[in-house]
Amino acid sequence: MFVKSETKTRGGLTAWFALTSVYKSEQFKSMAIAYTSPTAAILCEDAFQSMYAQMVCGLCQRHDVVRFGAVFAAALVRAIRFLQLNWGQLAADIEAGELGPHVADPSVREAVSGILRSDAELAEFVRIECSKGDWAGIITRIWPNTKYVDAIVTGAMAQYIRTLQYYSGGLPIVSTSYASSECFFGINLRPVCDPSEVSYTIMPNTAYFEFLPVGEVVDATNLVDLARVEVGREYEVVITTYAGLSRYRVGDVLRVTGFHNAAPQFRFVRRQSVLLSVELDKTDEAELHRAVERASSALLRPRGVSVAEYTSRACTERIPGHYVVYWELLTESPVGAGDGDTVDGETLGRCCLEMEEALSAVYRQGRVADGSIGPLEIRIVRPGTFEEVMDLAVSRGTSIGQYKVPQCVTVPSVVELLDSRVVSSQFSPALPHWIPTPRSD
């Protein structure tokens, strides 16, 4: 849990991120007993000091932890990555019974001092577990009483499901609720369902909800209310809130999966935006995720490797333009763990083609029929690259607690960072399958 510094509007009003307002509220502070992280550590605006303090307190109270959670799945993956990088110093501080100079915030040091005690046995345990190089099931190995993982794993966060399953040893992954900065939307009434099947039941008392059918003209006459949505259809959600937003388009696309009594249930599909486009092709985040998942499950997982994080961009620096997909890999075995270049060129090329086979017919037509789209390229980046991307975003004002890995990057400095961390790359070695559809007329 992390906060971001607040700012003031020209009119003198306080402006802050939604999660920051939650963590600074009296209601949240009254629930401090439910967390291993002391409030001072959560409210520390220095990301490293906050993460370090929360991790050391979590280790000291490892037998008390029954829920391993964060708002977004990405934050949990970052926490384990932090442990991978800093376990030596964490163990040293636990053995000494006090924080080193790397945590300088007085309020954080005071809060942690009430929890941290010299414990040579725990320090040695952390060293033994983390030095193995095998991070499979690390959550249940260090926090043995953990019953489930709690985080949002829908939409862009779906890419972390496999990684969390690996780190947790197969614990249930629970995505409890659906909310945004604008309002609260709904809850998951089947919390232990498969992460890929999460649906949220809309809470009709949190806002006035209307829905714009996907593909229809953006017009008030096409909006439907909660009672008139149809199962199987996709809608863009439009809200009118108590705070004053009127028919505000949130940008989320939802699919109706059923009803609980009279309340509709929705599955988050994607953000209403196109990620990649070179010519006539239009690839959104859901389609890109399916393509990555198809290649990963078919060609990487049998080799004990998976995609930990990914992003993409449309490269038009050469003609024809092509898709570039950046992968950071996770090696799911002690041998070679932490090595970013764990897939041979032939396999990586097959991954490129497998992704292309999963993309739309329009994309494949551009590749096969007229050559207007070049071969898809996968670039493997070294471990820790996406952590650096996050650090760059945070340094520019993004809240670490609400940070999401962008599914498409266009900012030159981010592209430059990614390209500077590439350890191997490969293009699709062949054309994807495409057969022209006969015209009905």
Swiss-Prot record:
Stated induction or repression of this protein's expression: At low level by auxin.
What are the protein's GO molecular function terms?
A: acid-amino acid ligase activity
From which domain of life does this come? Eukaryota
Write down the EC number. Answer: 6.3.2.-
InterPro entries (UniProt xref): GH3 (IPR004993), GH3_C (IPR055378), GH3_M (IPR055377)
Q: Which residues form a coiled coil?
A: none
Question: Which GO terms fall under biological process for this protein?
Answer: response to auxin; response to light stimulus
Q: Pull one GO CC term from this UniProt entry.
A: cytoplasm
Tissue specificity here reads: Expressed in etiolated seedlings and roots.
Extent of the signal sequence: none
Which cysteine pairs are joined by S-S bonds?
none
The top EC class, named as a word, is ligase
Which controlled-vocabulary keywords does the entry list?
A: Ligase
* Function (record text): May catalyze the synthesis of indole-3-acetic acid (IAA)-amino acid conjugates, providing a mechanism for the plant to cope with the presence of excess auxin.
PANTHER family in UniProt: GH3 DOMAIN-CONTAINING PROTEIN, INDOLE-3-ACETIC ACID-AMIDO SYNTHETASE GH3.1-RELATED
Q: Which family does it belong to?
A: Belongs to the IAA-amido conjugating enzyme family.
**Protein name per UniProt:** Probable indole-3-acetic acid-amido synthetase GH3.9
The gene from which this protein is expressed is: GH3.9
